Each structure stands twice: as structure tokens, then as C-alpha cells.
UniProtKB/Swiss-Prot annotation:
Belongs to the UPF0342 family. It comes from Bacillus cereus (strain ATCC 10987 / NRS 248). Gene3D superfamilies: YheA/YmcA-like. This is UPF0342 protein BCE_0953. InterPro entries: Com_YlbF, YheA/YmcA-like_dom_sf.
């Protein structure tokens, strides 16, 4: 019997939510949100990050001023232990999710590589 792919996806969602890195991420995020200075700095970083992404998606040039502002925010973030822990944990979780994505995409990769060899 074939498994319903959506059921498998929900199982994966549950596994991610139960993952230790995800639990640590939630705790780290709560710690950032509970500290006014960390929260404001994190919000500033997210706003800057989204603004730069939007510019790139629209084909706009990232100016030297944009780069300088980004570097200044990143330098301040590196001084905040709560945000640093949050970002390190998020990075570890992103590696896991990237690995899962590679596994999920393997059948398509095999299909297309077999087509190219034919």
C-alpha cells in the first residue's frame, strides 16, 4: 500500500518540531523576545535583511550605504549572546532541513540524470 505523501509530510513536520535543535531554537527565540534590547536589535536585523532581499529580488542595486548599515547591524548582533545563540541554532536546523530537502529531491535528480544519460 502506498503511503499518502501528505501524511508523511506531517510526520516530518512533527519530527522537526520534536528535534532538539528546534526546541533550543524556540527557547532562544523566547529569550531574545524577552529582552527588550535583544528584541529591538533582532527586529532591526530582520527588517534590514528583508529590505536587502527585496532589493535583490527587484533587481535593485545594493548600495555601499546598504552594505555599511548591514555590517554595522551584524557587528552589533555578534555582541549579543542571545541573538548569536539563536542564529547558531537556526543555522544547525537549516543544515538538517537542507539535508532532508536533498533526500526528498533525490528521485527527481535520479530521473533527470537518467534522462540525460539516455
Amino acid at each position: 500500500m502506498t503511503k499518502n505523501i501528505h501524511d508523511v509530510a506531517y510526520e516530518l513536520q512533527k519530527a522537526i518540531a520534536e528535534n532538539d535543535d528546534f526546541k533550543t531554537l524556540k527557547e532562544s527565540y523566547a529569550a531574545v523576545q524577552a529582552d527588550a534590547a535583544s528584541k529591538n536589535l533582532f527586529d532591526e536585523f530582520r527588517t534590514m535583511q528583508l529590505s536587502l532581499q527585496q532589493k535583490m529580488m527587484q533587481g535593485q542595486e545594493i548600495t555601499e550605504e546598504d552594505n555599511q548599515q548591514a555590517q554595522e547591524v551584524v557587528a552589533r548582533i555578534q555582541q549579543d549572546a542571545k541573538i548569536t545563540k539563536l542564529m547558531e541554532t537556526e543555522q544547525r536546523l537549516n543544515v538538517v532541513i537542507g539535508d532532508v530537502n536533498k533526500i526528498i529531491m533525490k528521485p527527481l535528480e535520479e530521473l533527470y540524470s537518467a534522462q540525460q544519460q539516455a
